[in-house]
């Protein structure tokens, strides 16, 4: 009587299978990414989504947003209902429009990034500064209320 057990494979066979599977996954990812972005953009025209770091200290939150090549006057920051929205525009230089590009990887156009903030912020004291292509936003936390005893009356 023979057992119908799967064959034990060595490490290199498993590794090769995983590499093939990853390659196929990448092919499908590329295909569907192109499919879902068409006709709004092509692989050479990607949306400008600013890279953002958010950190927290005891006193507040700090955001650092990369905005290289953007002028300070083209940045707009708003807060509404604990949602911080950063909008901007990166203009393409008009003299560059007539060039015959062989490769084009820089981003141009408008962008918007919205970040939901926690409820414990003091939105009246938010500060922003723009330096060397980095937007620094400081969001202080509200001061915690002190506990007080409430007398129960009969």
Swiss-Prot record:
UniProt KW keywords: Stress response
UniProt xrefs under CDD domains: ACD_sHsps-like (cd06464)
Domain sHSP: 43-154
Stored PROSITE patterns: SHSP
Annotated InterPro entries: A-crystallin/Hsp20_dom (IPR002068), CS_dom (IPR007052), HSP20-like_chaperone (IPR008978), Small_HSP (IPR031107)
UniProt-listed Pfam families: HSP20 (PF00011)
Domain of life: Bacteria
Recorded family membership: Belongs to the small heat shock protein (HSP20) family.
Protein name: Small heat shock protein C2
Organism: Rickettsia felis (strain ATCC VR-1525 / URRWXCal2) (Rickettsia azadi)
